[in-house]
Amino acid sequence: MVDYYEVLDVPRQASSEAIKKAYRKLALKWHPDKNPENKEEAERRFKQVAEAYEVLSDAKKRDIYDRYGEAGAEGGCTGGRPFEDPFEYVFSFRDPADVFREFFGGQDPFSFDLLGNPLENILGGSEELLGKQKQSVCTPFLCLQ
């Protein structure tokens, strides 16, 4: 059985801010692109961290997890009302990369477009010929014009 509090290395009474901070630290640490020499372990840990954050950052999911543990997370416990809404408490986990992008605001900070826009390079930096305007892309770590 996986203990989500242990995965994020936070106490059971941790605030949502502490959970957010722990996720940020561990998601950056275990991101598969930052661990090319140990990719399998990094992917496994990255998924665990994202799953733990999804449950513990949502008040309703966290309450169910605190009451019923992993069985609640898997939909095995519904608080004594088994037929009221059988899907109400089933947790569905998203792709860890989606959780990471949502948390960090857009692009993956570890993937860089080294070639840029090939048409922009060929046309001498002018996208107006293509009928497009340049847009800025900003992440918490980098801002591209």
From Swiss-Prot:
PROSITE patterns found in the cross-reference section: DNAJ_1 (PS00636), DNAJ_2 (PS50076)
Keywords assigned by UniProt, alphabetized: Chaperone
Gene3D superfamilies reported for this sequence: DnaJ domain
Expression tissues: Expressed in sperm (at protein level).
Coiled-coil annotated residue ranges, if any: none
GO molecular function per UniProt: Hsp70 protein binding; unfolded protein binding
Pfam families for this protein: DnaJ
Domain of life: Eukaryota
J domain mapped to chain residues: 1-69
GO BP annotations listed: chaperone-mediated protein folding
PANTHER family: DNAJ HOMOLOG SUBFAMILY B MEMBER 2, SIMILAR TO DNAJ HOMOLOG SUBFAMILY B MEMBER 6 (HEAT SHOCK PROTEIN J2) (HSJ-2) (MRJ) (MDJ4)
Job of this protein: May operate as a co-chaperone of the male germ cell- and haploid stage-specific Hsp70 proteins.
Protein name in UniProt: DnaJ homolog subfamily B member 3
Organism of derivation: Homo sapiens
